[in-house]
Amino acid sequence: MPSPARKFEKRPTLDNLVEKVDAQRPGAITGDTIPTGYGSLDKLLGGGFRRRDLILLGGDVGSGKSALALGIALRVAQQSPGVAFLSGEMNEERLMERALAIEGRVAVDELRAATLTDQTRAGVGGAAVRLRGLPITFLPLAGEDFETVFERLDPLRQVGLVVVDYLQLVPPPRERTTQDEDTALVLRHLKALALNRQVALLVVAQLPGFNAARADQRPTLNDYGVLGAPKQHADVVLSIFREEMYNPGGGVDGATELLVSKNRNGPTGFVDLYFYRRWMRFEDMLDPDR
């Protein structure tokens, strides 16, 4: 005797997803996607970062990790999603100083020494006007434990992107026996934080396994160390490679490869950026629509 046909239950999540796809205009990005403001990167990532994703950004010392993280934060804020930027190395004044340099295309030392020309002063003035109304909040990455640090996000509303600079300064939820175990535990909790708060979480990371003496200095996933945790918990891994750091005078000043070493929901590869070191500003090297 044939068994009775199985009656499938309704799946509201599936139904909602299908409705969303049907309603989406061709080429439009989904509502949970947050463009980074760097067109070439957004194109490779299918529109940008996605809410609930954990994104790592690593690179050698002095490669511009914090500058790129701040540049992304500013560009996201200009598109209206709120941004929270937690820094373990700079207070709000120093971060705003860097933001003025990036947006005003002026060197930080000129800001500090007040040696601005009429042209750069005008650039700073215009940058100040743009920055004043941006929905970006700077917070200290300091506290006795993980929960204390991230409770500071509770009063914030409409936040789409949270930036943490940097991973190794985040206090672990509880003490483990080694630094690697602490960092792996922090990554697991950061991923849970992204899921629970429905934000894209961009985390700057040092590379404990990086060796600048090797033949190819492009960072790899193995350079992130920490018991393979990035491979397990990160949805996207971005790595900065600037050849001028290893080949000075080689005619490649400013040229930057931003490697997408892991992309859970799409392709890997790299995009070409240009780094204006005096301004700590990254720009797309090529038209992303080419």
Question: Where are the language model's segments positioned?
Answer:
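Conserved H-loop
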Residues: G88-M90, V199, V204-Q206
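Short, well-ordered beta-strand core segments
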Residues: V83, L201, V237-S239
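Helical hairpin unit composed of two closely spaced alpha helices linked by a short loop
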Residues: G160-V203
